[in-house]
UniProtKB/Swiss-Prot annotation:
Assembly and interaction partners: Part of the 30S ribosomal subunit. Contacts proteins S3 and S10.
Xref: HAMAP family: Ribosomal_uS14_1 (MF_00537)
Record protein name field: Small ribosomal subunit protein uS14
Pfam families, A to Z: Ribosomal_S14
GO molecular function: rRNA binding; structural constituent of ribosome
GO biological process: translation
C-alpha cells in the first residue's frame, strides 16, 4: 500500500485543481499565459495522479474500475466486481 502521506498529497493537489479550474479556464480563454504562470504549479490538472481506491497504488491503474491491476485481480477472483468473469475460449 502507498504511504498515507503520498495519498494525502495527491488529494490536496486534486483540491487545488478544483479550486483554480474556473480561473484557469478564464485565463486560457483570454490567452493570458503570464497569468497562468502566476498560478500555483499544483493548479494544473496534469499534476494529479490516478490512484487505486483500495491500495493507493499509482502504477498499473485501470481507469474503468479505479483499481490497480493487483487489487482488480484479487477482487475479480473473489467475485466482488459485478459483471467481471474469467475469460475462457
Amino acid at each position: 500500500m502507498a504511504k498515507k502521506s503520498w495519498i494525502a498529497r495527491d488529494k490536496k493537489k486534486a483540491e487545488t485543481v478544483k479550486r483554480y479550474a474556473e480561473l484557469r479556464a478564464q485565463l486560457k480563454a483570454e490567452k493570458d499565459y503570464i497569468g497562468l504562470t502566476m498560478l500555483p504549479r499544483n493548479a494544473s490538472p496534469t499534476r494529479t495522479v490516478n490512484r487505486c481506491l483500495v491500495s493507493g497504488r499509482r502504477r498499473a491503474f485501470i481507469r474503468r474500475f479505479k483499481l490497480s491491476r493487483i487489487s482488480f485481480r484479487e477482487l475479480a477472483n473473489a467475485g466482488m466486481i459485478p459483471g467481471v468473469t474469467k475469460s475462457s475460449w
